[in-house]
Regions:
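Membrane-embedded alpha-helical bundles that constitute the cytochrome b-like, heme-associated redox core
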Residues: 1-153
């Protein structure tokens, strides 16, 4: 994976995660002092807009790293970061599907279920992906000696 791909994916993932968590917090844990208010916080709509508008860039970069990183790693066996990578992939697909369906759903019961799936998979993806990055960073510190041996052999 190229450096710009890693930075673009991490940046868009961070923006989508932060705006999603902040929007969820504003919508569900804040209460407006105005009994006639439609939103609980003045920035609630902005957080939702940033979340929804950043998500396509996040998905685009995911498609790029799918080709340059994920498919190649799926084909390799005994990768030390494999479990968190596969978990991230499954959670990303769940988060993506539920996020898309939230945009087009109309039934109140289905929307509640989709919100639960989207928030749950989004939170889980964020945690698992951060753990994937931490393990990758630790492996990267040990990798130069290992990669030089592989190049010689």
């Amino acid at each position: 994976m190229k450096r710009w791909e890693r930075w673009a994916f991490n940046l868009t993932a961070a923006v989508v995660a932060v705006t999603g968590f902040v929007y969820f917090w504003m919508k569900n844990f804040l209460a407006s002092s105005d009994p006639f208010a439609v939103v609980n916080h003045p920035w609630e709509a902005t957080m939702l807009h940033l979340h929804v508008l950043t998500s396509p860039a996040f998905i685009l970069i995911f498609g790029i790293i799918l080709n340059s990183h994920i498919i190649r790693k799926l084909g390799a066996s005994r990768m030390p970061n494999r479990k968190s990578g596969i978990s991230s992939l499954i959670l990303f697909a769940t988060m993506l599907g539920s996020g898309y369906l939230l945009q087009v759903g109309t039934d109140a019961a289905w929307l509640r279920a989709l919100v639960a799936v989207h928030v749950g998979s989004g939170a889980a993806f964020s945690i698992v992906y951060v753990s994937h990055l931490v393990v990758s960073a630790r492996l990267g510190r040990r990798r130069p000696a290992v990669s030089s041996i592989r190049e010689v052999a």
